[in-house]
């Protein structure tokens, strides 16, 4: 998780610095952090484009149009480099959102090690069906080194 936190330091998001590291057999396959897509201005430079929406349960959510999540950036980096991530693990500073979790499932990620819990309840049913493990990491020493 130490490397994952270092990757998060590259984030250009004003709302949360999130990092992701995809690993197989103790080798880093790809990294990602949250920020603007290539060629777009960064939130750090021009501010966030926040929109609000309601969940099916009526909870208010705020998201940024400008931001691509760390997990998606890591998946994109692997794809650009022709690196298969099937059967790999991902270390993320925060629990993935439901959209990133679905993408991770479809890429063949087997385990998600996460630091800060974020809307964990939204992933429980999907986790049961997909078999992708969600593994909390409370300290840098509680998971295999990324």
How should each PLM-predicted stretch be described?
Residues 1-146:
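Zinc-dependent deaminase catalytic domain
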């Amino acid at each position: 998780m130490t490397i994952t936190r270092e990757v998060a330091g590259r984030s250009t998001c004003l709302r949360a610095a999130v990092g992701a590291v995809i690993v197989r057999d103790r080798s880093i396959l790809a990294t990602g952090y949250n920020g603007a897509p290539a060629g777009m201005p960064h939130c750090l430079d021009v501010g966030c484009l926040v929109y609000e929406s309601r969940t099916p349960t009526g909870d208010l959510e705020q998201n940024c149009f400008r931001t691509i999540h760390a997990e998606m950036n890591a998946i994109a980096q692997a794809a650009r480099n022709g690196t298969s991530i099937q059967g790999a693990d991902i270390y993320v500073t925060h629990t993935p959102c439901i959209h990133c979790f679905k993408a991770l499932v479809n890429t063949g990620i087997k385990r998600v090690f996460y630091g800060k819990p974020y809307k964990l309840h939204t992933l429980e049913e999907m986790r049961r069906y997909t078999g992708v493990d969600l593994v909390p990491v409370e300290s840098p020493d509680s998971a295999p080194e990324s």
